[in-house]
Amino acid sequence: MDPYKNRPSSAFNSPFWTTNSGAPIWNNNSSLTVGSRGPILLEDYHLVEKLANFDRERIPERVVHARGASAKGFFEVTHDISHLTCADFLRAPGVQTPLIVRFSTVIHERGSPETLRDPRGFAVKFYTREGNFDLVGNNFPVFFVRDGLKFPDMVHALKPNPKSHIQENWRILDFFSHHPESLHMFSFLFDDVGIPQDYRHMDGFGVNTYTLINKAGKAVYVKFHWKTTCGEKCLLDDEAIRVGGSNHSHATQDLYDSIAAGNYPEWKLYIQTLDPENEDRLDFDPLDVTKTWPEDVLPLQPVGRMVLNKNIDNFFAENEQLAFCPAIIVPGVYYSDDKLLQTRIFSYADTQRHRLGPNYLQLPANSPKCAHHNNHHDGFMNFMHRDEEVNYFPSRYDPVRHAERVPVPPRTLGGKREKCMIEKENNFKQPGERYRSWPSDRQERFVRRWVDALSDPRVTHEIRSIWISYWSQADRSLGQKIASHLNLKPSI
């Protein structure tokens, strides 16, 4: 299977300059004018084409994850999990699958520093024999909110103020004061790991709960974990200021230079699995994206390794036009009823169609490398050559048939239509356990970051009190420390 199938030939294999249509250009230095100093003529098509193309070079940046870096490599199965899934690319140890990865910051713009305190995106596109599989995650195992209905408001709160275009703590703390479920995510973001040293030295997570299905149709819930073999490293606040002040693209450069030097970064893939019949044994909802699954109860199981051994050839084609979507899965992997995942299934593809056009999956970085066929025709920027006469189904003139049926999770659903919260929220236990697992100096840095955020002059007494109450419910001493620094009295 050729991972570079559908890649257009180079546009620069001519010995001389040409227009986009291939006509030779004998002068690329001067515009066509009336005399040496006269006005430029509109008939200078080369000038018009050159400027028009330049004016349209930029496309809409991603609404989140705008700043990113990509690399290519392979995934190799090291442990047999065929009893859990019928996915072809996981069929046996030794099987290799080409892939491309995009690491990113989340909130800030395309040219922002890579040293800001921000989650990091960790998205992997597997080019399998059964189509692409996009595992679209982050460097933290949890998320801010559990229901995708809140996602647009969440991003608005984290993004800069629409009036001043300045990111401000009072907006963030105001919004999340209504969402105590966010505490677990903030226990990562305001922790030392909130600023990874670079992309090679951070772990990754699928974040959402998916489902694995084996050949017999047996389904289990699954969480995906990427563990870096380089070791997890982070930047403390003063280090981030120093590194960011000297190179705002330090993580991109580190990734590129390491691969170019032959120091290929590697991650081990692990999974946690849970039989849906046993989910009531947990004190939280396993489909709640703000929770981690305890590894002492649901241990990590090794699956394989990912090696990045090739840099991208073109940043625009393989980073800006690279598009991921959690809806893109393969037989043997399926969704769950995770509320955030369910909304991501729609939203990601929708934003790619806005950003890149309806035929974004025809772009070389996004197209499958296996044979594929459907009747999705035409549209803006369609460049697939098709010469068939039958563009409907079914037809006795077209031999293409249905694929072999693949197992999907069997389930029976019942209930009334309603908008409601999940039953087992349990918002405070896991962030408290995480805080208590740290040494005292790490705890103190966490407290200091929260004190700095809550010291924003526009943060009201009410909002400060709410956050102290939340952190007190997670850990009484933590709430007391934050309150003491702010000269407030905890309510719990």
Swiss-Prot record:
GO terms for molecular function: catalase activity; heme binding; metal ion binding. Its cofactor is heme. It comes from the Eukaryota. GO terms for biological process: hydrogen peroxide catabolic process; response to hydrogen peroxide. Gene3D superfamilies: Catalase core domain. The active site is at residues 65, 138. It catalyses: 2 H2O2 = O2 + 2 H2O. PANTHER family: CATALASE, CATALASE-2. Belongs to the catalase family. This is Catalase-3. It comes from Glycine max (Soybean). The lineage of its organism: Eukaryota, Viridiplantae, Streptophyta, Embryophyta, Tracheophyta. The gene is CAT3.
